[in-house]
């Protein structure tokens, strides 16, 4: 029986060429799988047909936008996920859902291997292969671009030789990856960390320096997950899409950073994530209102580690499962509304409210009606500072 390989297919040059390369090098049949995570661009039916024309025995398109939002983006929001305190894990979140569908397709079609089009310098090769190892340890993984030394020129020559329906006449100066949660750009002039990004690199966001009439949005949350916008109940996928448009119109979510890649090198990355930055800003603010102080402090460390392990390709790991359990418990009761002003590249919180608010006006106010007994402060300070006071007395005794 002829072996089968399920290929993570994007419709671009590298993965289109990979179909023929896998057949030529291994003799295996290729099942192409394209997963829609809200990346937009070319029609997915056209991509499906291209895979068949390039030699795939079967070509599958999976609409995973809702699943991506509810099962991958929502946990990231609840975990305030920002790698290096800045990057909202745009690509990192989409890889594990693609891996999930690759493994499911491999089982359904009797494949004993999966393949991806990643290079050997990026993080995605790790995310794909470690994810497959976690979900299906017996599956082999092929990486044609990395393992065959397939340069762009070689790929073009391969495509032309076989008459593959790939337009290679137009080449973006940037390497782009995008999905519902945002857009990433690298390569070209962006590889110079001193060079200012040209405006043509930005698609999801308008120039934040151009004055516009500010917009105001109110985001509703239930147990830490966004559920409504301006009083309208929306699915998370719908809500993210609308915020990408509205916040993006004010230049919100542009990030220019030097990033520590998992493989050990630093890279310059340009991100556009209007909805992500708006939602993460709102969620963190609502947590400040609703979480008990020690839970909030501890959760900041959990959030940071959660972002790191997801960036590092460990979505399907026991540590992430354990952290998820804590985040689930901490998020219960993170309900309410956050109002934000969108202007000049910033999503600024201007109001928040919650039925579970821990803000007590009678304790916080300095005006009439203050119920805070300031006389209690003296005893509290004495006990709080007692260890320091005892230590200082010892130091003075030993070191007069």
UniProtKB/Swiss-Prot annotation:
Q: Does the keyword Isomerase apply?
A: no
Q: Name one GO biological process term.
A: L-arginine biosynthetic process
| Gene3D superfamilies noted in UniProt | Argininosuccinate synthetase, chain A, domain 2, HUPs, Single helix bin
Which EC number applies? 6.3.4.5
Q: In which pathway does it act?
A: Amino-acid biosynthesis; L-arginine biosynthesis; L-arginine from L-ornithine and carbamoyl phosphate: step 2/3
GO MF = argininosuccinate synthase activity; ATP binding
Which residues does L-aspartate bind? 119, 123-124
Query: What reactions does this protein catalyze?
Result: L-citrulline + L-aspartate + ATP = 2-(N(omega)-L-arginino)succinate + AMP + diphosphate + H(+)
Kindly state which keywords UniProt assigns to this record, in alphabetical order. Amino-acid biosynthesis, Arginine biosynthesis, ATP-binding, Cytoplasm, Ligase, Nucleotide-binding
- According to its UniProt record, where is this protein located? Cytoplasm
Q: Which domain of life is it from?
A: Bacteria
Q: Which parts of the sequence bind ATP?
A: 8-16, 117
For this record, the Gene Ontology CC terms, alphabetical, are:
cytoplasm
Q: Where is the signal peptide?
A: none
Q: Is the keyword Cytoplasm in the record?
A: yes
Q: Which family does it belong to?
A: Belongs to the argininosuccinate synthase family. Type 1 subfamily.
| Subunit-level organization | Homotetramer.
Name this protein carries in UniProt? Argininosuccinate synthase
Query: To which species is this protein native?
Result: Frankia alni (strain DSM 45986 / CECT 9034 / ACN14a)
